[in-house]
């Protein structure tokens, strides 16, 4: 599928295209434009220098709407196809990580949202316009970014996170073991996995490694000393240290990582993973009963006027603090 396409005489980023198919209305948001690198954060306008470089006419940019606002209504064709009510307002759009951050009420500089599914993400809010000169992280306009209130979402992604843990479960751990029991088995190994280290970069090129594809590697195995429990623990420790490597990049950009907000899901269900992450980074980890779909619902609620602003949305339920 093409992620950016021309519709008539206007350009649609993927979320704009979906909204257009639902409503017949073509518009965009600053957040959406920033995902395609079409927004100039320093001057708070469309990135003319990029448009000029590629020879794009400014007329290709669709009407820019506020992130939380009516951006069209579901038309008859889409309603019939999807079983939605015709005329339902479309009032919010964003990517998965801004949605996750919204669900966790992460809005202000220094606040951090994280996930650890197939890939791992650390998403921090920056109050200054700066960047990593090596482009090892992505920067977007966060959901509450505005002229005069810089709120940039800086996204660190580690491709080899839960996918490594699931690979270990399939190929190393005892057959039929649950993730919960696998965590208990890993806890039998000492901190540091008795000298085994695993670099978890086996799921394609890593942005934080400057787009290098190093592959996953396992180091330090002693055939007379190590067993399944050591390898399982080493995998989780390797993932944690890859998080730490990326978090150091974010801190160099001026984003202090002192508290990490995360949903009670995926690898954050592992006591070993979250306790190791807290110990290595020095950050407090808070787990909440929420996910990105809740963030999307809250965003739509703000856009339609159910909530007056971000400060009026409810806090998620905190499950634990590590």
Q: Which residues make up each language-model segment?
A:
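Phosphate/pyrophosphate-binding loops at sites that engage ATP/ADP/AMP, CoA/4′-phosphopantetheine
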Residues: 4, 48-58, 246-258
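Active-site nucleophile and cofactor-binding loops and adjacent substrate-binding regions
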Residues: 9-10, 14, 31-33, 63-69, ...
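Activation-segment/catalytic-loop signature of the eukaryotic protein kinase fold
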Residues: 193-285
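ATP-dependent carbohydrate kinase catalytic cores
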Residues: 38-148, 174-180, 184, 192, ...
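Single conserved hydrophobic/aromatic residue that forms the stacking wall/gate
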Residues: 2-8, 13, 311-322
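Glycine-rich phosphate-binding/hydrolytic loop that grips phosphoryl groups
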Residues: 99-103, 154-162, 166-169, 237, ...
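Short beta-alpha connecting loops at secondary-structure transitions
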Residues: 139-155, 220, 261-262, 277-285, ...
């Amino acid at each position: 599928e093409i992620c950016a396409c021309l519709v008539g005489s206007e350009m649609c980023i993927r979320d704009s295209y979906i909204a257009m198919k639902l409503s017949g209305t073509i518009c965009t948001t600053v957040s959406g434009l920033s995902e395609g690198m079409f927004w100039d954060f320093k001057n708070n306008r469309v990135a003319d220098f990029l448009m000029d470089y590629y020879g794009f006419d400014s007329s290709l940019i669709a009407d820019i709407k506020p992130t939380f606002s009516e951006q069209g209504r579901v038309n008859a064709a889409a309603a019939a196809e999807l079983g939605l009510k015709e005329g339902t307002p479309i009032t919010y759009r964003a990517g998965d990580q801004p949605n996750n951050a919204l669900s966790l009420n992460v809005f202000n500089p220094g606040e951090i949202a994280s996930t650890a599914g197939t890939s791992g993400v650390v998403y921090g809010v920056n109050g200054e316009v700066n960047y990593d000169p090596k482009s090892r992280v992505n920067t977007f306009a966060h959901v509450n970014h505005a002229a005069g209130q810089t709120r940039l979402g800086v996204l660190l992604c580690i491709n080899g996170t839960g996918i490594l843990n699931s690979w270990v479960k399939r190929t190393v751990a005892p057959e039929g073991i649950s993730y919960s029991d696998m965590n208990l088995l890993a806890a039998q190994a000492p901190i540091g996995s008795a000298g085994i280290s695993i670099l978890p970069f086996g799921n394609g090129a890593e942005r934080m490694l400057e787009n290098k594809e190093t592959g996953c590697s396992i180091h330090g195995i002693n055939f007379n000393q190590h067993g399944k429990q050591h390898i399982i623990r080493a995998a989780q420790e390797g993932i944690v240290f890859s998080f730490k490597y990326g978090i150091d990049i974010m801190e160099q950009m001026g984003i202090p990582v002192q508290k990490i907000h995360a949903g009670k899901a995926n690898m954050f269900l592992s006591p070993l993973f979250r306790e190791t992450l807290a110990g290595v980074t020095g950050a407090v980890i808070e787990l909440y009963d929420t996910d990105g779909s809740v963030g999307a619902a809250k965003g739509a609620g703000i856009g339609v006027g159910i909530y007056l602003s971000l400060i009026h949305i409810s806090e998620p339920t905190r499950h634990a603090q590590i």
